[in-house]
Amino acid sequence: LKPQNTTAKIAVQIALIVLSVMFFLPLLWMITTSLKPIGETMTTPPRWIPSQILWSNYPKAIFYDSKELGYVPFFVYAVNTVVLTGLVVAGTVFSNSLVGYAFARLKFPGRDLFFAITLATMMIPFPVMMVPTFALFKWLGWVGTFRPLWVPSFFGSAFSIFLLRQFYRTIPFELSEAAKLDGCGEFRIFLEIVVPLARPALTVAALFAFMGTWNDFMGPLIYLMDQRTFTLSLGLAAYQSQHGGTLWNVLMAATCLVILPVVLVFFFAQKVFIQGIATSGIK
């Protein structure tokens, strides 16, 4: 290797290491704070290693009794989040796989125009849609229920449609033609040929839906009124005292428990995730 190439590679690696440490520091601070006594959470200068490791903060987070809101039903929030996330993931995979297939492999009048309009919806900021969407769901009588949070997933999302459409286009059309010669219809071709080959892209769409729903705060904040219907991200607000005295170590322990499923899912599915992202833009 030439000296300048070696120097450039070393510089890039050092920059990547520094950025990785910078991104990891907040997570490390959250983990260490979740194990600290309450007196060490706000010390100056900050104390990274707790003098005493308190694993008891995690049971306290699960069975927390808030001064303002009373007992915090962590398990109820967890069940609500799991149910809601499951519905959104199912709706996302079901609807977007069908729409993406139509845009990628079927020919019909106005296909490219409709696809362009679908992509254009990604340019609309969420705050612009927030008020009219809330008015629509209020007119339907859905405010205060989970339906505004999961029903839209069954009508497709522009990003997942684009992702799946791009992946479908990488699958050889000769496979579909051969299946048609054997008497297969479009739906059977979709189920038995395209879907098995598109598992990496479908997994990516499911992962994005999972992470987006699990971490969603604004949606539940707008539509959920009863504390018994709160999700985990919204329920974390109950750990904060409005009059001072927030137990930050308990709050950080609860936050660690909330993000743990997302970290585990991404850790075990990262190979498929990267494969789906990398192969969706080949063609």
Task: For each feature predicted by the language model, list its residue ranges.
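A structural signal for multi-pass alpha-helical bundles of membrane permease subunits
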Residues: Q4, A8-K283
